[in-house]
Amino acid sequence: MNKLSTKLVVAIGIGAALYGILGLWGFSIAPNTFIKPALAILTVFGALFGPVAGLLIGLIGHTVTDTIAGWGIWWGWVISSGIIGFAMGFIQKRVGFSVKNGTYNKGDISYLAITGLIGIVIAIIFAGAFDIIVMGEPFDKIVIQVLGATIADVIVFLVLGLPITIGLAKSNKKHTHLKIEK
């Protein structure tokens, strides 16, 4: 089994703390459903540190949010945050892509957008199904929550997560217009 480096463990801790605390803040759009800017943390940290970090940040951070908020831990939604973080981290595995080094192309951005959107949809459907099957929640309530959460997460991903990740990569781009004279 691969060991997690100290740097990765620290990144997971910081990301989970940020995601957990920022997850307490959001705008209500449906029953128990919010637009939460914290989702951008999963995009940025997933792109920086990969799918395992994204998964753990989502799982730990969402557990922190639910614990501090005092409404109990909703495991389906905790797991969905992990799935979203995991999906966001796939981009980090692409050859030539690096937020840290500022190396990316349009294909990388498209890949992040597609894997992020697919991850959000899969995760939210999973959370809804979990709530119906395991938690015994009413179907009609969950349909509203799933639609609201999907729309909210897609908006946050496209308006905050993706642009912040691209901005970080651009700011780290190593380019110069200096030429070596012979």
Swiss-Prot record:
Topology of this chain in the membrane: Multi-pass membrane protein
Where does the chain cross the membrane?
Answer: 9-29, 40-60, 71-91, 114-134, 142-162
Q: Per the record's keyword annotation, is Oxidoreductase included, yes or no?
A: no
Q: Where in the cell is it found?
A: Cell membrane
| Pfam entry (one) | ECF-ribofla_trS
Q: What is its main location?
A: membrane
| Keywords from the named record | Cell membrane, Membrane, Transmembrane, Transmembrane helix
**Gene Ontology CC, one term:** plasma membrane
- Record-linked HAMAP family: UPF0397
- List the PANTHER family hit by this protein, alphabetically: UPF0397 PROTEIN BC_2624-RELATED, UPF0397 PROTEIN SPR0429
**Into which family does the record put it?**
Belongs to the UPF0397 family.
Q: What is this protein called?
A: UPF0397 protein BCAH187_A2708
Q: Can you name the source organism?
A: Bacillus cereus (strain AH187)
